[in-house]
Structures are given as C-alpha cells and as structure tokens.
Amino acid sequence: MVHLTGEEKAAVTALWGKVNVDEVGGEALGRLLVVYPWTQRFFDSFGDLSTPDAVMSNPKVKAHGKKVLGAFSDGLAHLDNLKGTFAQLSELHCDKLHVDPENFRLLGNVLVCVLAHHFGKEFTPQVQAAYQKVVAGVANALAHKYH
C-alpha cells in the first residue's frame, strides 16, 4: 500500500496519462542495464547487450520495458493493493528467476529519472516525491515473496 495524499495521487495519475509506455519502458529498462550492468545476467536471451548503444536499440529490451511499464500501470490502478497486484510477479521473480529484489528499487529510481528527463519542468519536486513513494511501494510489493 502506498500512502499518497489526494494531491499526490492526482499528480501521479495526470502525469502517467501522458507517458508513452513503449518509449519510456524501453528507455528505463535500457538505462538500468547500462548503468547497472550486473543486471544484464537476467537477460541472457536478449542478444547483444555489449555496449550502451546495443542495449538501448535492442528490440527485446524495448519490448520487455513496455511489458514492465504495463505492469506498473496496473499497480497505479491498484495503489491500495500493490502486494496483491504484484503477487504473481513477485513469486516469478523470486522463485523462478531469482532476481535480487534490490533491482526493483534500482529500476524504480531509473524510471523516476527517465520521467524527469521526458517531462522536464512538469516533473516538479512534488511530482518526483509522489513518484518516489509509488516506485518504493511497487519495489516492496515485488520483493514481498522474498520475505
């Protein structure tokens, strides 16, 4: 559960309505893989991830980034039940993929940076603070099965 004020929830929802999930998802996942290269080990089947340009132009990275942000969108629609919303993904990432749950926090922070880059002045400190709460809540929900 994420505790947002009415104003924070409105700001998150308003900005998210303008997000191009295809573009932002691929960019966020790509930046995660470039900035934190050890995360690439979970994506061996994605082909060439040898350089930043290769990562950022990789169609599998873009497609998976879109999928990730689709799940994030579902979370935004269920802020009062993030653990339930992400239960299956938490189980998958914990039991089958063995993803370090710290990676969820890293991806959330990268997503906030990408949103700031795309929205500039519209991504005010207040909007950033609200998104930091949301990505922290999503990361906690995804890490739930690890506990």
Curated annotation (Swiss-Prot):
<feature type="modified residue" description="N6-acetyllysine">
    <location>
        <position position="83"/>
    </location>
</feature>
<keyword id="KW-0408">Iron</keyword>
<comment type="function">
    <text>Involved in oxygen transport from the lung to the various peripheral tissues.</text>
</comment>
<dbReference type="GO" id="GO:0031838">
    <property type="term" value="C:haptoglobin-hemoglobin complex"/>
</dbReference>
<dbReference type="InterPro" id="IPR000971">
    <property type="entry name" value="Globin"/>
</dbReference>
<dbReference type="GO" id="GO:0005344">
    <property type="term" value="F:oxygen carrier activity"/>
</dbReference>
<dbReference type="GO" id="GO:0004601">
    <property type="term" value="F:peroxidase activity"/>
</dbReference>
<dbReference type="GO" id="GO:0005833">
    <property type="term" value="C:hemoglobin complex"/>
</dbReference>
<comment type="similarity">
    <text>Belongs to the globin family.</text>
</comment>
<comment type="subunit">
    <text>Heterotetramer of two alpha chains and two beta chains.</text>
</comment>
<keyword id="KW-0813">Transport</keyword>
<feature type="modified residue" description="Phosphoserine">
    <location>
        <position position="45"/>
    </location>
</feature>
<dbReference type="GO" id="GO:0020037">
    <property type="term" value="F:heme binding"/>
</dbReference>
<feature type="modified residue" description="Phosphothreonine">
    <location>
        <position position="13"/>
    </location>
</feature>
<dbReference type="InterPro" id="IPR050056">
    <property type="entry name" value="Hemoglobin_oxygen_transport"/>
</dbReference>
<feature type="domain" description="Globin">
    <location>
        <begin position="3"/>
        <end position="147"/>
    </location>
</feature>
<keyword id="KW-0349">Heme</keyword>
<dbReference type="GO" id="GO:0042744">
    <property type="term" value="P:hydrogen peroxide catabolic process"/>
</dbReference>
<dbReference type="InterPro" id="IPR002337">
    <property type="entry name" value="Hemoglobin_b"/>
</dbReference>
<dbReference type="GO" id="GO:0043177">
    <property type="term" value="F:organic acid binding"/>
</dbReference>
<dbReference type="GO" id="GO:0031721">
    <property type="term" value="F:hemoglobin alpha binding"/>
</dbReference>
<keyword id="KW-0479">Metal-binding</keyword>
<keyword id="KW-0561">Oxygen transport</keyword>
<feature type="modified residue" description="N-acetylvaline">
    <location>
        <position position="2"/>
    </location>
</feature>
<keyword id="KW-0597">Phosphoprotein</keyword>
<dbReference type="GO" id="GO:0019825">
    <property type="term" value="F:oxygen binding"/>
</dbReference>
<feature type="binding site" description="distal binding residue">
    <location>
        <position position="64"/>
    </location>
    <ligand>
        <name>heme b</name>
    </ligand>
</feature>
<feature type="binding site" description="proximal binding residue">
    <location>
        <position position="93"/>
    </location>
    <ligand>
        <name>heme b</name>
    </ligand>
</feature>
<dbReference type="InterPro" id="IPR009050">
    <property type="entry name" value="Globin-like_sf"/>
</dbReference>
<keyword id="KW-0702">S-nitrosylation</keyword>
<dbReference type="InterPro" id="IPR012292">
    <property type="entry name" value="Globin/Proto"/>
</dbReference>
<feature type="modified residue" description="N6-acetyllysine">
    <location>
        <position position="145"/>
    </location>
</feature>
<feature type="modified residue" description="N6-acetyllysine">
    <location>
        <position position="60"/>
    </location>
</feature>
<dbReference type="GO" id="GO:0072562">
    <property type="term" value="C:blood microparticle"/>
</dbReference>
<dbReference type="GO" id="GO:0046872">
    <property type="term" value="F:metal ion binding"/>
</dbReference>
<protein>
    <recommendedName>
        <fullName>Hemoglobin subunit beta</fullName>
    </recommendedName>
</protein>
<dbReference type="GO" id="GO:0031720">
    <property type="term" value="F:haptoglobin binding"/>
</dbReference>
<dbReference type="Pfam" id="PF00042">
    <property type="entry name" value="Globin"/>
</dbReference>
<feature type="modified residue" description="S-nitrosocysteine">
    <location>
        <position position="94"/>
    </location>
</feature>
<keyword id="KW-0007">Acetylation</keyword>
